[in-house]
Amino acid sequence: MTERTLVLIKPDAVARGYVGEILGRIERKGLTISALDLRTAPGDIAAAHYAEHEGRPFYPGLLEFITGGPLVAAVLEGPRAIAAFRQLAGGTDPVEKAVPGTIRGDFGLEAQENLVHGSDSVESAEREIALWFPHLAAN
């Protein structure tokens, strides 16, 4: 069964020149990139995207980071796309939990600026796709 996921290539990855490498890894994995947009995240979309973290100590810094420069938003499709991308991404903390061979394990330096975001469930994917690509929202 084909599944969709939202991926963000975060501002730190864009600034460090890793967009091509990350997209290449996605394509080599066999996932289809069905939507792609380079943009600076508007504050309202960023706040809605990270709403589950509101009130936590790191939330203001997270919003500042994600809106602080260009990022790439993408929709990926493929069998088990959510799990497949999360495997490519590696653990959230690039130094403590991400293994070499993953995006974060190979290029990540710190937990907050960890290069990429990938949806963690079908429900999250559909909610996030609707935020970043409203015209692709599931009916």
Curated annotation (Swiss-Prot):
It is an enzyme of class 2 (transferase). Belongs to the NDK family. Homotetramer. It is found in: Cytoplasm. NCBIfam families: PRK00668.1. Keywords: ATP-binding, Cytoplasm, Kinase, Magnesium, Metal-binding, Nucleotide metabolism, Nucleotide-binding, Phosphoprotein, Transferase. Pfam families: NDK (PF00334). It comes from Rhodococcus jostii (strain RHA1). One of its GO terms (biological process) is GTP biosynthetic process. The keyword Ribonucleoprotein does not apply. This is Nucleoside diphosphate kinase. Gene3D superfamilies: Nucleoside diphosphate kinase-like domain. It catalyses: a 2'-deoxyribonucleoside 5'-diphosphate + ATP = a 2'-deoxyribonucleoside 5'-triphosphate + ADP; a ribonucleoside 5'-diphosphate + ATP = a ribonucleoside 5'-triphosphate + ADP. GO terms for molecular function: ATP binding; metal ion binding; nucleoside diphosphate kinase activity. Its cofactor is Mg(2+). The lineage of its organism: Bacteria, Bacillati, Actinomycetota, Actinomycetes, Mycobacteriales. Major role in the synthesis of nucleoside triphosphates other than ATP. The ATP gamma phosphate is transferred to the NDP beta phosphate via a ping-pong mechanism, using a phosphorylated active-site intermediate. Its EC number is 2.7.4.6. ATP binds at residues 10, 58, 86, 92, 104, 114. The active site is at 117 (pros-phosphohistidine intermediate). GO terms for cellular component: cytoplasm.
